[in-house]
Amino acid sequence: MGEDGGGGEFPPKKDGVEEGFPTKKPARQLDFTGGSDEHSLSKPAAPTVVATSVKPIISSSVPSTIRPGMTIAIGQVTQVRPTLPMATTMSNPPSQSQIVNAPIRHPIPESPKARGPRPNVEGRDGTPQKKKQCNCKHSRCLKLYCECFASGTYCDGCNCVNCFNNVDNEPARREAVEATLERNPFAFRPKIASSPHGGRDKREDIGEVVLLGKHNKGCHCKKSGCLKKYCECFQANILCSENCKCLDCKNFEGSEERQALFHGEHSNHMAYLQQAANAAITGAVGSSGFAPSPAPKRRKGQEILFNQAIKDSSRLSHFPQVNNGRTGGPTSGTSPSPVSRAGGNASSVPSKFVYRSLLADIIQPHDVRALCSVLVTVAGEAAKTSTDKRNEIENRVDDQTETSLASSAQDQPQGNNNAADVEMVATDHNQADKSGPEESNSDGVDASKVTPLSPATLALMCDEQDTIFMVAAPSPNGSVDPNGCRPNSQGQSEIYAEQERLVLTKFRDCLNRLISYAEIKESKCLSLARMHIQPPAIATVKTENGIQQQVPIVNGASRTNCQPTLNKPQPMQLMNTTSAAPATATNTQHLQKPPALSEKKDP
């Protein structure tokens, strides 16, 4: 690009352009070197920054070598940041000497109305974040500590008072911008060199992390290791630089903690999505007794959790693997061991497990309903039995009384006998009339001892009366108590006590059967877990008959059996006593068929 390269070589001169062009306008042609107009127009030159008051002429015949969005200032190439509110004018000056002599002015931010709406700033996980709103009270939103003014945007929906950062007060806003730039030319420079307001082309990709940009002021983290979202560098997905004043920083290139954090988040997120899809398809979390819960987004000390999961693998072996149906005897190939499942999960990604009860598939809703019906039936039978006993006792007492009266009447003289009989009969009738309506439901208790009740209380108690649990013996004269809603007699207390005893006894028997089922199932799972963890060694033992048998060795000691048939695996029910086996079979029928429950009397 020498000065002596003729004007007609490249690009070719055009007479039309030369004739229609003014000959002497140095301010418009920016010819500060004294060259001819033809040379200045025909030479390709380096780009430069021109003041906004100067309007240069761009020749259509000169090819442009600069891209839009680039500006050159004093031989130093810098990239224009999209968030800077600057108005730049591109031109093709004639020579390099103009770069030295061109005046340099601080660009004035353009009005926000000239730019299109900015997209919402996305976080590290791609979630759009809401635009921050300012709360200025006394600055009229024309100071740098107003986030809207510092970012070059108008206040929109903010909580500010007496705001001038809007379209109506554009002249005042312009003056504030110019005054701020005179004091600090870099006032409107964003904190991050590659501002996130532009396209998120530098977003992190698993496998190849692209990290560009630098924090102009730096972060000041002290305890987070710069691996939390409140670290501005970490939130912007850039590495900490020399501008940062953080302590114990782990946000640098090659940091194992940062890589483990990113890759762990990605793998856990993908695993959880796959698990959720499988659960949606099958309609259940899983057939086993464990349902892995979704892993948290942020994990602290993954190595500690991994080691802890390995150490707890033996504890997980005690947890059963629950099948969909009721399990029978243990077999070696019927169901996989829960230890293999726990070990597989621990080796890939440590996750939490939700323990299911041993009785998860044993107790069914119809079993609970059957138990309730059985208890109600037992209570009703107990009430009837107690009532019958009371009636029988009362009849015996009446018979004895009549017998004694008859014998005493025979011993007295005949004259006095008639008068005594009349007096006795009258007395009995009077007592029956008095005690009948008042004490028919009290079983001989004095009516004066009964606590009087209000009509509202009596109505409520009558509504809640249960015919099964409140069976009262009829009075001898057949009368009915008009206030018979509150049992206060000794007989009713005995009935309730008997009902409670029988109900609790039946419920205790049911709980004992459930405990037996759980113990049997636990023994099955433990045997399967032991077989999976440590298969029994086979040793050759010579018996008394001279026949060599192979028996398992448990804990370093071989166990020999006299009968070869005992070496075969037996069902778990046979491990209990012979009396427990039929009881278990009958117990299963009791849960399914309530009427067939066998009543066990306490010793």
From Swiss-Prot:
Database matches in InterPro entries: CRC, Lin-54_fam, Tesmin/TSO1-like_CXC
Chain intervals for the UniProt region annotation (Disordered): 1-47, 105-133, 316-347, 386-417, 429-450, 584-603
SMART domains to which the protein is assigned, alphabetical: CXC
Expression across tissues: Ubiquitous but expressed mostly in flowers.
Keyword Transmembrane: no
BP GO terms, sorted: regulation of DNA-templated transcription
Subcellular location: Nucleus
Segments passing through the bilayer: none
Protein family according to the UniProt entry: Belongs to the lin-54 family.
Record text about domains: The cysteine-rich domain CRC binds zinc in vitro.
The protein, known as: Protein tesmin/TSO1-like CXC 5
Species, as recorded: Arabidopsis thaliana
